[in-house]
Amino acid sequence: MTTLGRLERIDRIRSIWPGEESAFTPWLAKDDNLALLSSAIGFGPEGLEHLGTEVPLPGSGYHADILCRETGGGEDALVLIENQFGKSDHSHLGKILTYASGLKAKTVVLIGETIRAEHRAALDWLNGLSTDGCRFFAIEIELWRIGDSLPAPRFNVVVEPNDWARRATEARILSEDGNLTPARQMLLDYWTRFGELLDSRKGR
C-alpha cells in the first residue's frame, strides 16, 4: 500500500520570513512569487509586471510595499500590494486607500496572516461602491509542508470584487446625472478622511 504524506500548516510564518519589510516583501517581489499571487487573484501566472518595491508616495514620506502593472492593461493599470504580518488593522486599511489614491492604482491587494471580519466588510463595501474599475482584494498568507519538504506558500483570497453585483447595483449607486448619491459620497468622504487622520497621527 502506498504511504502518503500529511499536510501540515506552519503556524509561525516568521520562522520563514523573520520580518514583513525585510523578508516577506522582497520575497514576494520576485517574479516567480508574484506569479503565484497573480494566479491566486485570477490574473494568470504572467498577469503582474513588477514596477518597484518601497515605492514613494508623491508629496509624503510614505512608501507603498510593492507596485505592479497588470500585464497588457495599459500604463494606468497599476496594482498596489500592501503587506502586513499578524491581524489586519485600521492603520493598514487607511494606508491602502491613501496609497491607491496617491499612486492612482486601479487594483489594491492587502495581504496579511488574518484579515479581520470588519476589514473584509469594509473592502467588500468599497468593491460594491466602485464604478470606475477600481478593485480591492484581501488575501491571507499561509505556509504548508508535507513531512520534511520545503515550505509552500498559499494565498487564500478572502475578499475579491463581485463584478456581477457591481453591474447590478451600479444604477442604484449613481444618481441620474452619473454622480454618486449624497449618501454614498458622504461614506466615501468619511473613509478618505479616516485614512488621512491615521496618516497624520503616525509617529506621534
Task: Write out the residue ranges for each language-model feature.
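Charged, terminal alpha-helix-loop-beta segments
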Residues: 1-204
